[in-house]
Amino acid sequence: MDGKEINKFHALQLFTDTFAAETVHLTNEQVGIYIRLLCFAWTKNAKPFTTESAYRICQCQSKECEGNVYKILDEFFKLESFLNNIEKWTHKRLVQEHEYLTAKYKKRSEAGKKGGLARSKNVA
């Protein structure tokens, strides 16, 4: 890891029982929008994004699509104000998972460095 902070994870664990229970009322299009937004947020390290960004992420070209995106944002994401009163969306569970994994891998990395250092001293 060479001093680099771990913050990019290529896989997102999907808790299928929770996901299915929380999305059973959505249309297939809305489920796709939700998954697309979750995946985008995960690849960006769970960083917040604007409503306009969400429309672009979901490739909206109609008011109907924008309405579906906003429905998903409003139901599953949290709107927060940031610098200059810019409002952005976050997903609480994604942020928690990202923080958990970052801490977990940082701890493993530190333990590995200690183990490697101990082995190198024993070899000499």
Predicted regions and their residues:
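Winged-helix/helix-turn-helix nucleic-acid-interaction surface
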Residues: M1-T18, F49-A124
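Short recognition helix of helix-turn-helix/winged-helix DNA-binding domains
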Residues: M1-T43
